[in-house]
């Protein structure tokens, strides 16, 4: 279902990175029905080593939990941080060059006017027919009211947000010129950024805290899913988190 034309992305949810690679290989490339698809080269060498690869990590997010974290998440942070540090140690032993990085200092979340405007356009027929009144969740932050609010996004705000989005993409490309991929917790603020810039990412199970899986995210350069997948495969070959499942009884 279309939600936001310039941000919607199709991805796979699989047990292993190898499975993700198979699904991605089937999905990628033009099919003649979507003019936004790019016929970019994709060469995956899953057995290539990681030695010498430049791997960044968002230093702030490896050292403190998100400001938006719940009380439970803040309580669990020390255990999660140990899992993240273990992941860094694993990559360090694999011979990668780890380097701390910081995200571009631009208000990624504040330009979500783009996201909301595109959602309003995608559901324009529903809005005009009054179908949003039948949606569940009538509270102020519910989907129905979110769609109504898209009617009142000023054109000036939308255009300015597009300009900031362009700057954000330029700064992300400059950042990615310094590293092959970068690592972050799965609840990283980078998801707001890459949602706008299109940089590919892969989330892996990095362990468990109080019985709940916690993730490690690998983000790569534009159209370089192959490197993201290769790094993810190396991580899963060195760990067993992805093979753990809850008891069925």
Model-derived regions: residue spans:
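A short helix-breaking turn/cap at a secondary-structure junction
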Residues: 1-81, 238-249
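Short, well-ordered beta-strand elements
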Residues: 12, 212-224, 228-232, 236, ...
């Amino acid at each position: 279902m279309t939600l936001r034309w310039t941000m919607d992305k199709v991805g796979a949810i699989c047990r292993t990175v190898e499975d993700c690679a198979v699904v991605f290989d089937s999905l990628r490339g033009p099919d003649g029905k979507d003019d936004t698809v790019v016929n970019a080269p994709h060469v995956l060498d899953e057995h290539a080593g990681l030695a010498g690869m430049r791997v960044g990590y968002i230093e702030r997010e490896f050292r403190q939990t998100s400001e938006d974290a719940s009380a439970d998440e803040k309580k669990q942070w020390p255990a999660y941080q140990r899992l993240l540090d273990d992941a860094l140690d694993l990559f360090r032993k694999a011979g990668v060059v780890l380097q701390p990085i910081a995200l571009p200092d631009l208000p990624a979340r504040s330009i979500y006017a783009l996201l909301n405007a595109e959602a309003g356009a995608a559901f324009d027929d529903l809005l005009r027919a009054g179908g949003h009144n039948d949606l569940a969740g009538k509270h102020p932050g519910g989907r129905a009211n979110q769609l109504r609010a898209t009617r009142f996004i000023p054109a000036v705000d939308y255009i300015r947000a597009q300009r900031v989005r362009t700057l954000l993409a330029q700064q992300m490309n400059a950042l990615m010129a310094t590293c092959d991929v970068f690592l972050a917790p799965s609840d990283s603020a980078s998801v707001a950024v890459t949602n706008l810039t299109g940089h590919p990412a892969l989330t892996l199970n990095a362990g468990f805290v109080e019985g709940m899986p916690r993730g490690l995210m690998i983000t790569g350069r534009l159209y370089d899913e192959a490197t993201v997948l290769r790094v993810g495969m190396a991580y899963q070959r060195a760990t067993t988190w992805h093979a753990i499942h809850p008891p069925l009884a």
